[in-house]
Amino acid sequence: MFKKKASYDYYQKFGYECFGPLLWGYTHWLIKNLKEREIKKVYFLSRDGYIIQKAFELVNSDSDIENHYLEVSRRSLRVPILWMDSSFEALLSMLSISEKISLQSFFDCIGLDMDKYRELITEHHLNKDSFFYRKNIRNNINLTNLYRHLQNDIKKNSQTEFSLLQTYLHQMRVEGEFAIVDIGWSGGMQRFLQKTLNKIGVENHITGFYTGVAPFYIRNMKDEKLNLNGYLFDYSHHYKEDERSPFVGLYETLFLEGRGSVKCYRKISDNLITAERYPYEYKTNNNEYLIIKKIQDEALKFIKDIESMEIIKYFNFSSDDLFSNLKKVGLNPSWKDIKKLGSIHFFDEGEVTTLGGDHLLSFYLLHPKQLKKDLLSNRWKTAFLKKMLVLPLPYYKIYKGLKKYQK
C-alpha cells in the first residue's frame, strides 16, 4: 500500500514510502486530539511546522479549527526572555542538548554576533573554533568569565527583542486557549512562549503537539508547567524508546521549510511587525534544496493518494506501522541510503555537518581525537558508523552501547 511506482527516482520513492506515511499518521493523530480536546485554534511553528500545516490542510475537514503559521524559532523566542534570568545555570537549560557545544552555538543562544566580540573572546583565551563538553562546561572559567563580561549587552539586546516579540504575538492574536504544533523534542519553544505571555499578562492555555517528546523535556518544566503530547514517543506521559535519536538530523531535515530560520522581529510600519530571517542554509547548494523539496512533495502526494482511498478508513495503523519505513532507513541504512542522503548538510545552531560524516576509518586512525569530536557532532550516527567501519555490523546496537558508555 505504501509503495511508489518503480519509475520514480530514489528521493521520490523515499518521500512517498518513508516520509509520507509518518506525516499522514501524525496529522490524523493531531486532528483527533484537537477535536477530543475541543481546541479551536492551532499555530504551526516555523520552520518544521510548515510541511505539517500543508498536510493538515489536506486532511482536515473541520472548518471550525482555525490554523495559523507562527514565524518563530528557538532563537527568536529564547533571546527575548534572557533579561528575566541571565544566570549561567538558566542559560544551560536553553543551550543545545548536544554533548559537544561550540562557541558559535553559545553565541547563537545568547543572541549576539560572535564576530563583533573577537577581541573579548581572545582576551578570555578562546577562539571561534572553541568547543566545550556539556558534562564539564560549568567548570570552564574562560567561558563563564566571558559570559559575565557579556551580561550588559545580552540584557540590552534581550529587552529590545522582547518588546518586538510582544508586538508580533499581539499582531498574531496569540492568546487564550490554543495548540502549537512542531516537530519536538522537549517543549523549549513552548516554555519560552508561555513565559513571555505570562510576563506580559496575556491569558493563555497552551497544548503542545509534537512528533515526539524526548526525556530531556524535564529541563523545561522547572519554571513553567507545560502540556506536552508526543506521537511516536512521549516521555512526559510514558516510556517508549526514542528510535529517531540516532538519525535526528535526517529526520529534522525532512521537515525543513525552504526559507531561513527566524532571527528576530522588526517594525516595518507603526502597525506591522515582520519576522526577520537568516539566509536559507541551502541557498548556495540548490541541489540539496531540490532534494528536500522533492521528498516533501512526494510525501504530500502520498497523503492525497491515501486520503482518496475509501477503504483506508477500515484500517487502524499504529504510529509504529507508519514510522517503520523511515525507521528502517534511519537505523539500518543501506549503502544506497548513505550515498543518496548522507552527503546532505545539516545546520544546527551555528554548526554544520554532513549527515553521513566525511571520513573513513583510515582518517581517524591518524586523527583519533577528531573521531570523538565528529561522532558527537554527527546527527545520523548509524550512517556515520557504517560509513567509517564498512563492515555489516548491528550499528543501532553499537550506538546504544556508546550512549550507555557516554553516561
Regions found by a protein language model. Name each.
Residues 1-407:
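Long, low-complexity, Lys/Arg-enriched
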